[in-house]
Amino acid sequence: MTDIDPHIWGPSFWSTYHLYASSYPIHPTPIIMDAARSFVKTIPFTLPCSSCTDHAFAYIKNIQKQDPDLISIVSSKMLFEKFFIDFHNSVNYRLGKPLLPESVARKKWRF
């Protein structure tokens, strides 16, 4: 894999993730939950950075240990939004960046 600097693509990816979460239905149907589950599982494959890919796989796998079907992520809009905020903050923490307050995320991406 050719690593591309996350400063180039990271902000766009985060905006995509958070905007997807902001448009997620309050009460998703089973089909929408399946699509969201697939989206989350696909995230590591879309990252053009090997350490980012490794982190995403580990983060998602850790959730799947307790929740193999990711119900705790996809069963409601609030949980889906929270997943992406928590995921974003796990990356920020790993990189020594400031954490993203939920209130800031909600204002920026209009949750």
UniProtKB/Swiss-Prot annotation:
Root EC class: oxidoreductase
Residue ranges the record marks as coiled coil: none
Record keywords, A-Z: Disulfide bond, FAD, Flavoprotein, Oxidoreductase
Domain of life: Viruses
Gene Ontology MF annotations: flavin adenine dinucleotide binding; flavin-dependent sulfhydryl oxidase activity
Residue ranges crossing the lipid bilayer per the database entry: none
UniProt keyword Cytoplasm present: no
Residues covered by the ERV/ALR sulfhydryl oxidase domain: 2-109
Enzyme Commission number, as recorded: 1.8.3.2
Cofactors: FAD
Family: Belongs to the IIV-6 347L family.
Biological role: FAD-dependent sulfhydryl oxidase that catalyzes disulfide bond formation.
Name the UniProt record assigns to this protein: Putative FAD-linked sulfhydryl oxidase 347L
Organism, scientific name: Invertebrate iridescent virus 6 (IIV-6)
Top-level taxonomy: Viruses, Varidnaviria, Bamfordvirae, Nucleocytoviricota, Megaviricetes
